């Protein structure tokens, strides 16, 4: 009898493990998603404890993967009081044979923040080489010293092979800084640029104000660098009014102009996508990639039928005759 029970238990456990390993999640719970493809599977990295991860063979059905970090980086806990390992808004890029992951350490409504950096040679947790090696802080912001917020990184390599990091949330908007050729620090001498700002009243730098812009993502297409940002407010469930705005420039340093020719440093930005109030109350924090010859936009949307919980949004992007992206249904 015990032997039969043991066999039954083994079969049930095997079934449970099979279910866990299967790609069965069609609408993953995500916030601030970015993606990478390793040649066989797609991986989502997003806000969560230790950085949440999903993987998929086809971009349609997903499964949970282990978080990037088992424990919060000690340097970040010391640098950012109140940070407990719930890590925001990562970005990932494959560069010089490694996957470089950048991530945000902060607390809500404050700009005592830091952007960290980790490396791995593979994304597959089953690969014996799999190990995220934390490299520490790239840049941080401190009230009274910086009028910007060091979160929401996006790293892009320009046409000359130079790595740049754009980042920012509220305060004085979106910044751009040159990185070293190893992506492990800010390049010297330092080069800083301002890319996007929404106009607001002057406030003490300890306050975010109403400069509601964040989540920059730069994508190159047809001779232009396109700057995607998110306007207005996330994280309020059904009351969120997040939306995606865009501008473009022939120089990664800017200026970025919207469809009307208005600078994104002067409250410009053409609205690309927002909540339809049928499926999503709001949509934002996007990333853009080319997979299998098709350009895709990924974001999170606050689902009306799930009481405003954030889920993955995936849309194809096409381009109009003037070279501006069009979000397909």
Show the residue positions of the predicted features.
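Carbohydrate-active catalytic/glycan-binding domains of CAZyme proteins
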Residues: 19-329
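Bacterial N-terminal signal peptides
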Residues: 7-16
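Positively charged n-region of N-terminal signal peptides that target proteins for export
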Residues: 1-5
